[in-house]
Design a protein with these regions (language model features):
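Flexible, low-complexity linker and terminal segments
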Residues: 1-178
Length: 178
């Protein structure tokens, strides 16, 4: 194959190089020649190659803010929920609760320490402004991960007081009751 072994990225043809052509496009390419291919075996190979390339991407570790070492609740978010979740965490900490917050910036691939971080806390809530796609994705990628979920599909940002109220209910409930 015409790939760099470490990165799995195809070599680029240098203009004028005999036997090579620089080809751009969205159609599936043959793994050996780079020519357009509709062969099913080649398609399988190329899909697996793309998945391997994505898995090799180095992303920063997932960081935890707040009471990172001994929180009773970890609040997990992604993207634009950061400010609202951080404000809710700070309000809960001001009330004396031990709370931490982790905000994903990368989800494919996940940070290498994802399972370690999520497995460290008694209760984890994934707060999303959708129907729970991140929670479902994390359950599929992290063995044994069963988070609580706070989902809103209103087309509006979270209201911090609603987050605080919901998270406080989780914190007050015994682990076996929630």
């Amino acid at each position: 194959m015409l790939f760099r072994s470490a990165t799995k990225v195809r070599y680029w043809a240098i203009p004028g190089q005999v036997g090579y052509a620089h080809i751009l496009g969205g159609l599936e390419k043959d793994g050996r020649t780079g020519a357009i291919s509709t062969d099913p075996e080649n398609h399988d190979l190329m899909c697996r190659l793309r998945a391997e390339k994505v898995a090799r991407i180095s992303v920063p570790d997932l960081t935890v803010q707040g009471d990172a070492d001994d929180a009773d609740l970890l609040i997990v978010g992604f993207g634009s929920t950061y400010g609202h979740l951080m404000s809710a965490m700070e309000e809960l900490r001001a009330k004396g609760y031990k709370v931490a917050q982790a905000q994903f910036r990368h989800i494919n691939p996940l940070p290498k320490n994802t399972a370690e971080v999520l497995g460290k806390y008694k209760k984890v809530v994934v707060a999303e402004q959708n129907l729970g796609q991140l929670a479902a994705y994390l359950r599929s990628k992290v063995d044994g991960f069963v988070p609580f979920q706070f989902n809103q599909v209103k087309g509006q940002p979270f209201v911090v007081s609603e987050l605080v109220e919901n998270f406080e209910t989780l914190l007050k409930a015994p682990s076996s009751a929630v």
